Amino acid sequence: VECNKMNIHTSVIDPNKDSPCKNQCDNFVLGDLNNFDDIVKFGSKCDIITFEIEHINIDALVELENLGKEVYPKSKTLRIIQDKNLQKTFFIDNNIPTAPFKYFESIKDLLTSIDRDKLKFPFVWKQTKFGYDGFGVKVINSASDVEKLPDKPMIVEDYIPFEKELS
């Protein structure tokens, strides 16, 4: 709406044919945000590309950058945002305060760490990819909780009691 007031032409790609933005933009394209070809075809017609959600095909954004398109945030930044392990490592490398964490490739590796008393309950489990707004995040209080987790790469953080989360 604000872009319209400033005479800025907007295009939107969305997988939902009934997307709320459909009636607010100048050009609406129905497309898959994870499909390389959909994103490159869409982005090649734009001057500047930005996105509302982090779950988008990074390789397509790299291709668009290579074609000289302005992409914000940059694909390099998005790659870090999409992976909790890379994100936490970035925080540590840049002296940004964050909860202590460990990375595990599998549930087997996690259980081995618990069995060797290298990890104490409770802790916070986070899948490294495709988690957001509480999805892919669980407080783990016991080994029986671990058995219910999906077997995919993960980080576990020390449990830190808090009053409010800001994001």
Model-predicted regions and their roles:
Residues 1-86, 108:
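ATP-binding N-terminal substructure of ATP-dependent carboxylate-amine bond-forming enzymes
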Residues 23, 61, 135, 166-167:
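Hydrophobic alpha-helical membrane-insertion segments
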